[in-house]
A protein has these predicted regions:
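Non-transmembrane, aqueous-exposed alpha-helical and coiled segments at domain scale
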Residues: 1-428
Length: 428
């Protein structure tokens, strides 16, 4: 048995999709276990760019099965759209399956998400308005619609009627917006169920049988630990657990089955939307990193906020996830910067120096990062494939991260293409 979990360690957009794409070529199964189509995974095959939101990033390379597990919330219309686009480009799609237990994002979830963000105005959480949060709300409230319900006309009818009574009252009385039609939603989703029926399976049985048979299984997270509902910068977080722990409940596997826990972090830090960001660069250098790194959201197109690498938050993320293999991406973006800074401690508002990540989101706005400075490099590293061929200062940068975290960096990414990696050890 060989299991691999790929998780983000910052605020998303670390390059998990590329790493998953690389690892999936050797995988028998690729499994997404949380989130929804609020994710944005960009992978390249030659000059062809694929932006995936709901499908696992490994769908392009995996020779076995790609599974959207029970912890994912599924917009079936978005799923069908992505599958069709993949087919148009000649991609294989007959190996993609969805858990019967996965909850369905309904039209009223998307509207709720949108109306709430509009109402919040300047205090927006910064959601993608894809209905993710409201769908998870209904799941916890035990009124959600699951994929298996799309295959049962009577259950689907009952659940949509019950939900629309509440949601339409909310739309009309509170938001002063138009109500939704039961007939339109019911007929549309009944038809969707028939279209997808051969893809809707008991994924937890499939996955656990594969573990028992010693297959290579890659679990793919979306978003990242600093957006985790419990351990992120609450409330500026997502509605699920993008941690390694989320694999167990999100895919239905025991913790004893998880072996290789791979954490992915950029060589600097980015964030989309609102929330504290201690090392943020609101200057020309921040803009330079944004442009060189093409830091614009794959899902929303929003410019990402940029800043120096924050090892305080990274240590927190590695601890919660139990990371035993580290990946550093976009090292090439830092080329040409004379002096590089890495945050190793925070100075609190009352003058204390701390090296741990606080649970108080409001205090983070007042914390000042304490930096270590390292010399940069000028050499182009995008064609480097052997660690020893990196400039000395680039190696010192990587080794500083390793020493602080006490975790080995097994892979360094130096460009967006699949081949632009420096692999220091094989874990597959």
């Amino acid at each position: 048995m060989s299991t691999y979990v790929v998780v983000g360690l910052q605020y998303g957009d670390e390059g998990k999709g590329k790493i998953t794409d690389v690892l999936s070529a050797k995988s028998d199964y690729v499994v997404r276990y949380q989130g929804g189509n609020n994710a944005g995974h960009t992978v390249y095959v030659g000059d062809e760019k694929f932006v995936l939101h709901l499908l696992p990033s490994g769908v392009l390379q995996c020779k076995g099965k790609c599974i959207i597990a029970n912890g994912v919330v599924v917009d079936p219309k978005a799923f069908i759209s992505e599958v069709e686009k993949l087919e148009e480009k000649g991609g294989r799609t007959d190996h993609i399956f969805i858990s019967r237990r996965a909850h369905v994002i309904m039209p009223y979830h998307i509207l709720l998400d949108t109306y709430r963000e509009e109402e919040h105005g300047g205090t927006q959480i910064g959601t993608t308005k894809k209905g993710i949060g409201p769908c998870y709300e209904d799941k916890i409230a035990r009124v959600g619609i699951r994929m298996i319900d799309l295959l049962n006309p009577e259950i689907l009818k009952e659940k949509i009627e019950k939900n629309l009574r509440i949601k339409n009252a909310l739309f009309e009385k509170y938001f002063e917006k138009p109500t939704l039609s039961f007939d339109e939603i019911y007929n549309e989703f009944l038809a969707i169920g028939q279209k997808l029926k051969d893809r809707i399976i008991d994924t937890e049985i499939e996955i656990n049988e594969a573990i028992k048979d010693g297959k290579n299984i890659l679990f793919e997270g979306a978003q990242a630990l600093m957006l985790d509902i419990d351990f992120g910068t609450y409330p500026y977080v997502t509605s699920s657990s993008p941690s390694t722990g989320g694999v167990c409940s999100g895919a239905g596997v025991p913790p004893t089955a998880l072996q290789n826990l791979i954490g992915v972090a950029k060589a600097y830090t980015t964030r989309v939307g609102n929330g504290p960001f201690p090392t943020e660069l609101n200057d020309d250098l921040g803009e330079k990193i944004r442009q060189i790194g093409h830091e614009f959201g794959a899902t929303t197109g929003r410019p990402r906020r940029t800043g120096w690498l924050d090892l305080v938050s990274l240590k927190h993320a590695c601890m919660i996830n139990g990371i035993n293999n580290l990946v550093i991406t976009k090292l090439d973006v830092l080329t040409g910067i004379d002096t590089l800074k890495i945050a190793t401690k925070y100075l609190t508002e009352d003058g204390k120096i701390i090296d741990y990540f606080t649970s108080s989101t409001t205090k983070l706005y007042d914390y000042e990062p304490i930096y270590e400075e390292l010399k940069g490099w000028e050499e182009d590293i995008t064609k480097v494939r052997c660690y020893e061929e990196l400039p000395e200062n680039a190696k010192k940068y990587i080794e500083f991260i390793e020493q602080y975290l006490g975790i080995n960096v097994y892979l360094v990414s130096v460009g967006p293409e699949r081949s632009q990696n420096i692999i220091r050890k094989e874990i597959f």
